[in-house]
């Protein structure tokens, strides 16, 4: 009789990946990042266990979108005060905080709850080409 393998949290081996976002499309990049963070690329993937890897994204300021989304895509947030709904389009968000656009896209693709928050903490985003995780010896990942 066959038994379904379930990964134990202690047995998960995590790797570090670095992705260069220069010239990449936002959605296609975000789906691959979310897939790596969840661990769906591994044969020992278990939905209720954090089996994902660490992902470093460099050159987040050079992420692109197709069509007219640079002006038409609007990001909203509310400060909590009455009448204080804030909005910014894609290009404004990229100027203010280059990594935030990718973070929002990936966050929407991860599970909601404590597991998704733990997986999102393994995402490291940098606007330039330098990152501070060279001690982990990340593997370059082409998308």
Swiss-Prot record:
Coiled-coil segments: none
Gene coding for it: rplM
InterPro entries (UniProt xref): Ribosomal_uL13, Ribosomal_uL13_bac-type, Ribosomal_uL13_CS, Ribosomal_uL13_sf
Entry's Gene Ontology cellular component terms: cytosolic large ribosomal subunit
GO BP of this protein: negative regulation of translation; translation
GO molecular function, one term: structural constituent of ribosome
Pfam families for the chain: Ribosomal_L13
Superkingdom of the organism of origin: Bacteria
Matches recorded under PROSITE patterns: RIBOSOMAL_L13
Quaternary context: Part of the 50S ribosomal subunit.
Record carries keyword Ribonucleoprotein: yes
Descriptive protein name: Large ribosomal subunit protein uL13
Task of the protein: This protein is one of the early assembly proteins of the 50S ribosomal subunit, although it is not seen to bind rRNA by itself. It is important during the early stages of 50S assembly.
Keyword DNA-binding annotated: no
UniProt family annotation: Belongs to the universal ribosomal protein uL13 family.
Lineage, highest ranks first: Bacteria, Pseudomonadati, Pseudomonadota, Gammaproteobacteria, Cardiobacteriales
Entry keywords, A to Z: Ribonucleoprotein, Ribosomal protein
SUPFAM superfamilies: Ribosomal protein L13
């Amino acid at each position: 009789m066959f038994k379904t393998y379930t990964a134990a949290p202690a047995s998960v081996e995590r790797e570090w990946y670095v992705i260069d976002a220069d010239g990449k499309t936002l959605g296609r990049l975000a789906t691959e990042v979310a897939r790596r963070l969840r661990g769906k690329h591994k044969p020992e993937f278990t939905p209720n266990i954090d089996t994902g890897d660490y992902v470093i994204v460099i050159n987040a300021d050079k992420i692109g979108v197709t069509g007219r989304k640079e002006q038409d895509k609007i990001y909203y947030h509310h400060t909590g005060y009455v009448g204080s709904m804030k909005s910014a389009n894609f290009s404004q968000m990229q100027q203010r905080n280059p990594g935030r656009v990718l973070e929002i896209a990936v966050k929407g693709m991860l599970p909601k709850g404590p597991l998704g928050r733990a997986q999102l903490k393994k995402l490291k985003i940098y606007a330039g080409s330098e990152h501070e995780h060279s001690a982990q010896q990340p593997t370059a990942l082409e998308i």
